[in-house]
């Protein structure tokens, strides 16, 4: 897989991540800044590092499964490896301007 193909897959991944929501927050996980890394590998697997807005997120399992299902539905993705990371700790500065406006922080 060449670099251009990887970039196209990464763009499609971002598009599907924008359809994943924490059930308690009306902003998608991409704009919340919960995705730290997306790496598309030559074999079509994707390594994704993500976090939660709270360490004890009650919807964690639901969100991770939604992310995995949607990533694996992207054309060109063979499998998704989702790594939960908590450093750096998520804070409001990681949100997009759009998310800050939606949530009344801007």
Q: Could you describe each region identified by the protein language model?
A:
Residues 1-106:
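Domain-level signature for proteins that mediate thiol-based redox and metal-cofactor handling
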